[in-house]
Structure formats: C-alpha cells, structure tokens
C-alpha cells in the first residue's frame, strides 16, 4: 500500500519533502526523516530522467514514498516514471477535465486507463501480484495553477482515476495578477486556495499544496489539507547556510 494512501485511510494528512537538487545521498537522507513522501521536482529543476531513476530508489530505501512532479502532463513520461518506481505523480498545469483525464489514463492499466504494462521496479516491490493492486499503489494529483483551472475545478475533480488536486500557489497568484509568492497572504489568492480545498473535499477528493516553510505547512495542515510539502531542499540548504554564516560572523 502507498504510504500516503495509508495516511489518508487512517485519517491523517501526509507531509512531504521536496527535491530540486539532483543526487541520491541527500534524497535518501531526507527520506529517512519524518516525511511520508519525498517529491522530486522535474519541472523547475535540472533533474533529468537519468538522475531521477536512482533518486526514486534512494527515497524508497530511506523509507518515504517516492513522488515526482513531472515536467508536463504527458502520458509517456508519466508511465516511464511509474515503471521506474514513482508511486506518486503530480502533474502540472491541469486546466480542464480533458487534461485531468489524460493524467488519469496514464496512471491506470486497462480497463480503467491506458497505462502500458512494464512495471520493472514496482514488480520488485510488489511481486507477481502487482497488476491486481497497481491502482492502489499509485497516487495521482492534478495541479491547479491558473484562473482557467479554478473555473473548471468541479469538472477536474469529477474525473475518476485521480486522487485529487495539488495547488501551485506561485503560478496561481501570478495568473490572478499578484506577485508569485509561495506562502502568500494576498486575499484573492487565499480565497481561491480555500475554494479549491472546499470543492475537493465536497467531491470526496484529496487536496494538497506546496508550502515554503514549516510554519506555513503547519497552518495548511490545520486548515485540513491532505498532502502538504514544506520547503524545497535548495531553500533549506540556503537558509541553513545563511544561519551558519551569521553565527560564524557574530563577533
């Protein structure tokens, strides 16, 4: 069973790390912390497929569920990542029901979807019984990042085969005419985020959000979000380095 899905089945939200730097060592190190999942960001990072495959192994070895935010909502890319051992897919810029259906079809085998059969790494974890439980091992979230997606939110949420939606607050803020801040307090953006959360839960779906800090993640967890990421690795590295430098220079 997918660890994130286990959290949800037990009535708990899932907390995830976020990786923008390539490499297996720090991927495993983060996965060994108290994260339920670790997301590899292939959209806004230099990480390519040759790098992501061993990172998926490292995250699984560390004990967290390996997720990927894909470059685009492309079925061939999604299927390849699933075969490489991704157990969660976050697809960017899903604006319509048709685009959500594209994501859903890539996540599931026939008759529920169009995923091609070749689960090289999943079959190592789940054995010969993988096909029968494949849909339960994968979590699929469609990113809500535009005014168009907001207008179509109920249609997107009506798609069978996706678990829910994941809010990208910076692109959403930008498309609504505001500064692209992660932990935004802009009233229109805050209202839009709350609306997505409410519509998702009304539809019986899960809702996640990207957060830039642990404090903001705590707020979103308290608000009822089901899947929350808290600060990417590069931001945490920079913040820690700034603090070390400040401590060293505090003469």
Curated annotation (Swiss-Prot):
Co-factor remark: Shows a slight preference for Mn(2+), followed by Mg(2+).
Site feature: Improves activity by CH-pi interactions: 210
Cofactor(s) needed by this chain: Mn(2+); Mg(2+); Co(2+); Zn(2+)
Biotechnology: Could be used as a biocatalytic tool to prepare (3S,4S) aldol adducts through an eco-friendly process.
GO cellular component: cytoplasm
A matching Pfam family: HpcH_HpaI
Catalytic activity: D-glyceraldehyde + 3-hydroxypyruvate = 2-dehydro-D-galactonate; D-glyceraldehyde + pyruvate = 2-dehydro-3-deoxy-L-galactonate; L-glyceraldehyde + 3-hydroxypyruvate = (3S,4S,5S)-3,4,5,6-tetrahydroxy-2-oxohexanoate; (R)-lactaldehyde + 3-hydroxypyruvate = (3S,4S,5R)-3,4,5-trihydroxy-2-oxohexanoate
UniProt keyword Zinc, yes or no: yes
Marked site: Transition state stabilizer: 69
InterPro entries: Aldolase/citrate-lyase_domain, HpcH-HpaI_aldolase, Pyrv/PenolPyrv_kinase-like_dom, Pyrv_kinase-like_dom_sf
Positions bound to Mg(2+): 145, 171
Claim: ATP-binding is one of the keywords in the record: no
Binding site for 3-hydroxypyruvate: 69, 170-171
Record field: pH dependence: Optimum pH is 6.75.
Top class in the EC scheme: lyase
Origin superkingdom: Bacteria
Positions in coiled-coil regions: none
Gene Ontology molecular-function annotations: aldehyde-lyase activity; metal ion binding
Keywords assigned by UniProt, alphabetized: Cobalt, Lyase, Magnesium, Manganese, Metal-binding, Plasmid, Pyruvate, Zinc
Record comment: activity regulation: Binding of substrate induces a dynamic movement of the metal cofactor between an inactive coordination sphere to a catalytically active one. When oxaloacetate is used as substrate, activity is increased in the presence of micromolar concentrations of inorganic phosphate. The phosphate does not improve the binding of the substrate, but exclusively increases its rate of decarboxylation. Excessive phosphate concentrations negatively affect the reaction rate by removing the metal cofactor.
Annotated site (Increases basicity of active site His): 83
Physiological role: Aldolase which can catalyze in vitro the aldolisation reaction between hydroxypyruvate (HPA) or pyruvate (PA) and D-glyceraldehyde (D-GA). The condensation of hydroxypyruvate and D-glyceraldehyde produces 2-dehydro-D-galactonate as the major product. The condensation of pyruvate and D-glyceraldehyde produces 2-dehydro-3-deoxy-L-galactonate. Can use other electrophilic substrates such as L-glyceraldehyde, D- and L-lactaldehyde and D-erythrose. Also catalyzes the retro-aldol type decarboxylation of oxaloacetate, a general property of known pyruvate aldolases.
Protein family according to the UniProt entry: Belongs to the HpcH/HpaI aldolase family.
SUBUNIT field: Homohexamer. Trimer of homodimers.
Record comment regarding domains: CH-pi interactions between Phe-210 and the C-H bonds at C3 of hydroxypyruvate are probably responsible for its efficient conversion.
Protein name: Hydroxypyruvate/pyruvate aldolase
